[in-house]
Amino acid sequence: AMKFQNPRYINKMGDKEYMKYLPNGEDKSARYGTPRIKTPKEMIDYVHKQNAHIMISVWASFGPWTEMYQKMDSLKALLQFDTWPNNAGVRPYDPYNPVARDLYWSEMKKNIFDLGMDGWWLDSTEPDHMNLKDQDFNTLTYLGTFRRVHNAFPLMSNKGVYEHQRATTSDKRVFLLTRSSFLGQQRYASHSWS
């Protein structure tokens, strides 16, 4: 936020306001100690005080060590093929499943949106598909085989976030940045990049 507002500000390493947000800023040591920003809420508030907005990258996949993986797995809402990071057992969720979209948003809302987050960078919405095998496309989704519906993955994932945020509040504009798109996806406030 500071660099965007004034490109030379970032060079003011002695500035006490800037230094307090760097790890070990007081002694400029190379090792990292306790971060200056202690909580995500403090970081979001700091960016807002700089008259800027903040967005966060959110992936459509979960590792087996996470609570979300367990919840999605109990719904049979994980697609059974490898995604990023490779060879870690991480699986994309099934955005075609409305209950899975509800769960995905409930965690985003509780852990991120309620803190004041302004936008979403929805990454891996193709989704990333590692160790690709033809039979992976026979994986069942809520709407049938992945082969039949895989191109609509970004549409459904973006739809879920957009509709849930709009249902949560009309006081904050939805902004989604995504690297994957599908026809008509712009209606969900999706902006594609590549």
Regions found by a protein language model. Give the residues of each.
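Catalytic-domain carbohydrate-binding cleft regions of carbohydrate-active enzymes
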Residues: 1-194
